[in-house]
Amino acid sequence: MNMLVTMLINTTLSFVLILIAFWLPQLNIYTEKANPYECGFDPMSSARLPFSMKFFLVAITFLLFDLEIALLLPMPWAMQTQDIKTMTLTAFILLSVLALGLAYEWTQKGLEWTE
């Protein structure tokens, strides 16, 4: 009986919220609210906008460094192991690769936005 009452309340509340969601937006329609927002671009214009290659390279570099940092996330669980030297060596190698990659990008001016 208790489960039936709970399901009835949940179903009723869901239907009431759905009806409110469909009824409420029709009260005040503005032209600005009706237009979709596309990150500052006009959605009716051409989709072939010029794309900054520098932005693309910085975005790819960010993704690569983000994936390398994700390799370090299991380290707290690895600290529970009996072989602490292997875990420390692995963490040091991962951080070294990350630091070397950052130094390489810095020397090649891959992180500079303006040239």
Swiss-Prot record:
Major localization class: mitochondrion
UniProt lineage: Eukaryota, Metazoa, Chordata, Craniata, Vertebrata
- Record keyword Secreted present: no
Q: What reaction gets catalysed by this protein?
A: a ubiquinone + NADH + 5 H(+)(in) = a ubiquinol + NAD(+) + 4 H(+)(out)
The EC designation for this entry is 7.1.1.2
- What Pfam families does the record tag this protein with? Oxidored_q4
The record, for InterPro entries, names: NADH_UbQ/plastoQ_OxRdtase_su3, NDAH_ubi_oxred_su3_sf
The GO molecular function terms of this record are: NADH dehydrogenase (ubiquinone) activity
Query: What's this chain's function?
Result: Core subunit of the mitochondrial membrane respiratory chain NADH dehydrogenase (Complex I) which catalyzes electron transfer from NADH through the respiratory chain, using ubiquinone as an electron acceptor. Essential for the catalytic activity of complex I.
Q: What is this protein called?
A: NADH-ubiquinone oxidoreductase chain 3
Cellular component, GO annotation: mitochondrial inner membrane; NADH dehydrogenase complex
Q: Where in the cell is it found?
A: Mitochondrion inner membrane
Tell me the keywords, alphabetical order: Electron transport, Membrane, Mitochondrion, Mitochondrion inner membrane, NAD, Respiratory chain, Translocase, Transmembrane, Transmembrane helix, Transport, Ubiquinone
EC category: translocase
Q: Could you tell me which PANTHER family the record lists for this protein?
A: NADH-UBIQUINONE OXIDOREDUCTASE CHAIN 3
Membrane-protein topology: Multi-pass membrane protein
Q: Which gene encodes it?
A: MT-ND3
How would you summarize the oligomeric state and partners of this protein?
Core subunit of respiratory chain NADH dehydrogenase (Complex I) which is composed of 45 different subunits. Interacts with TMEM186. Interacts with TMEM242.
The family line of this record is: Belongs to the complex I subunit 3 family.
> Could you tell me the superkingdom of the organism this chain comes from?
Eukaryota
A biological process (GO) of this protein is: mitochondrial electron transport, NADH to ubiquinone
From which residue to which does any coiled coil extend? none
